[in-house]
Amino acid sequence: MDITDLHRMNELVEMFKEVASVLKKGRTETVYQNAITVELQERGIQYTEEETMPIYYKGKYVGQERLDIVLHTWLQVIIELKATTTDIKSDNLWQVISYMRYKKYKHGVVVNYNQSPSKDLTYSVVLLQDDLPYIYDLETGALTELTDYSY
């Protein structure tokens, strides 16, 4: 991740934290999503919400999935939101990875506005390098290859 992308990813995480600080726990995923879009609008960052991704099986259309928030220019990133009582799971990571591959984006982030009394906001930054997925630690810069292919 280059220095500009790193700076922008950190700014994005600060937006997630601001939303968590103001709204607290007990909201739906949609409410958190709407609040994030307010943060993006205030900064003039272009995005789309609920962008559809068609799914094909053996050349036949079988359905679609929806990408929560997609940033296109400021930082090409897919944002997948959760509001659950559990930690971010590998299937959440693989969900955003499939979206990243579809969009041909190198950056993704899964954000969980954790509803558990003992947990707060959690997030995982995902990078694709040579189509291999990694979890990126913003604080240390460490890359950990995601090898749990159980999804």
Regions from the PLM with identified roles:
Residues 28-76, 117-125, 143-148:
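Active-site metal-binding core of divalent-cation-utilizing nuclease and nuclease-like domains
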Residues 82-138:
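Nucleic-acid nuclease catalytic cores
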